[in-house]
């Protein structure tokens, strides 16, 4: 496989064996500087050969970097990068390429959408999370005053180029974090993917064929949802399953919990809410979800995050009141006092709720489930 186009709508996604293909860059003009956005970790470990190849093709390349990690996906980083684009006098006809994980792609997408009202955008994801989730669908965001993705836009890339070889540089834990989003895709929309993950959990790390099928299936699931609802008004909301709780965890834990870990716990809690609300009728699905998460060394309870979150943040995180207050900032809400949440109907199907795909949880049920999670922690 040199290059396989696995998605054409809402934007092109190509699965490639390497980047040393001249035709890959054929749609990008050499008449204007090519801007690359990445973090310092990717710059040190992956960027060199790609940069040499791009320069060999005749491009003038400007590389802008920022420190890695979610805590740096901030307004301050965004403005600093915008200033650098202005200082370099980057033309509106220049293309911008984001190379990295979810944080880099979020930041690059927001930069591309806002600089000169839009630069041609290309994305090169280097992590599982970025390949199966962040790079698909054109949604981007940065954090503001510690609130997850408070600022953002919908801005589609021209193309996304995925090279699974990049994943060989990742520690196994990074793979696991990305697989949380894949488990979500199976849970809300595709029972086949769910069974695929159950059947191929070990081969995923050793078989390139299985890995390619895994990436392809996830991209196609998300792309189909986005194509039907590009602006997050109805069906696309189901992609937020597990994320209401997850974003509250990430906010209260001050970025010390990885997004995949937070989504993993968020899915478990929101599944319990779905059952308690009577939306889901199969209690065994909770155990099935937990077993699959554990197979990939993912947490399933707030208690599982105890060793990750610094002790001085425990009182903040392990408080039902704090979690509910932080849920008030979730973008699905109609107001801070009218929470909205995605719920599961059965395996492979999120509850439609008459086409809104989200509903207000019973606050007593929500509090009781959060209290049971936090109460265990307070008595450890």
From Swiss-Prot:
GO terms for biological process: amino acid biosynthetic process; aromatic amino acid family biosynthetic process; chorismate biosynthetic process. One of its GO terms (cellular component) is cytoplasm. Keywords: Amino-acid biosynthesis, Aromatic amino acid biosynthesis, Cobalt, Cytoplasm, Lyase, Metal-binding, NAD, Nucleotide-binding, Zinc. Its cofactor is NAD(+); Co(2+); Zn(2+). It comes from the Bacteria. Pathway: Metabolic intermediate biosynthesis; chorismate biosynthesis; chorismate from D-erythrose 4-phosphate and phosphoenolpyruvate: step 2/7. It holds the Pfam family DHQ_synthase. It catalyses: 7-phospho-2-dehydro-3-deoxy-D-arabino-heptonate = 3-dehydroquinate + phosphate. It is found in: Cytoplasm. Its EC number is 4.2.3.4. GO terms for molecular function: 3-dehydroquinate synthase activity; metal ion binding; nucleotide binding. Binds 1 divalent metal cation per subunit. Can use either Co(2+) or Zn(2+). Zn(2+) binds at residues 181, 243, 259. NAD(+) binds at residues 68-73, 102-106, 126-127, 139, 148. Belongs to the sugar phosphate cyclases superfamily. Dehydroquinate synthase family. Catalyzes the conversion of 3-deoxy-D-arabino-heptulosonate 7-phosphate (DAHP) to dehydroquinate (DHQ). This is 3-dehydroquinate synthase. It comes from Chlamydia pneumoniae.
């Amino acid at each position: 496989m040199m290059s396989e186009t696995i998605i054409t709508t809402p934007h092109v996604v190509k699965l490639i064996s390497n980047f040393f293909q001249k035709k890959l860059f054929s749609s990008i003009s050499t008449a204007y500087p090519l801007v690359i956005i990445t973090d310092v970790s990717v710059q040190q470990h992956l960027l060199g050969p790609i940069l040499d190849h791009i320069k060999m093709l005749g491009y003038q390349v400007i590389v802008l970097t920022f420190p890695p990690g979610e805590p740096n996906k901030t307004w301050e980083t965004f403005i600093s990068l915008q200033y650098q684009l202005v200082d370099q006098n980057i033309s509106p006809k220049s293309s911008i390429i984001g190379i990295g994980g979810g944080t880099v792609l979020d930041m690059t997408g927001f930069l591309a959408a806002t600089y000169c009202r839009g630069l041609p955008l290309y994305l090169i994801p280097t992590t599982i999370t970025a390949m199966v989730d962040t790079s698909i669908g054109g949604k981007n965001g940065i954090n503001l005053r510690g609130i997850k993705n408070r600022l953002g836009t919908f801005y589609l890339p021209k193309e996304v180029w995925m090279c699974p070889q990049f994943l060989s540089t990742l520690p196994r834990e990074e793979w696991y974090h990305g697989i949380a989003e894949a488990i979500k895709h199976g849970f809300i929309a595709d029972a086949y993917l769910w069974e695929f993950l159950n059947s191929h959990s070990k081969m995923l790390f050793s078989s390139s064929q299985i890995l390619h099928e895994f990436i392809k299936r996830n991209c196609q699931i998300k792309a189909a949802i986005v194509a039907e609802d590009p602006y997050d008004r109805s069906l696309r909301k189901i992609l937020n399953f597990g994320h209401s709780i997850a974003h509250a965890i990430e906010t209260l834990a001050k970025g010390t919990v990885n997004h995949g870990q937070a989504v993993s716990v968020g899915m478990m809690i929101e599944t319990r809410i779905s059952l308690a609300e009577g939306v889901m009728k199969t209690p065994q699905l909770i155990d099935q979800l937990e077993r699959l998460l554990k197979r990939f060394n993912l947490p399933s309870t707030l208690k599982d995050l105890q060793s990750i979150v610094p002790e001085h943040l425990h009182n903040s995180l392990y408080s039902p009141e704090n979690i509910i207050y932080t849920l008030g900032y979730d973008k699905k809400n109609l107001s801070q006092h009218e929470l909205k949440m995605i719920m599961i109907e059965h395996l492979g199907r999120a509850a439609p709720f008459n086409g809104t795909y989200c509903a207000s949880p019973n606050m007593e049920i929500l509090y009781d489930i959060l209290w049971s999670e936090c109460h265990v922690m307070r008595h450890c």
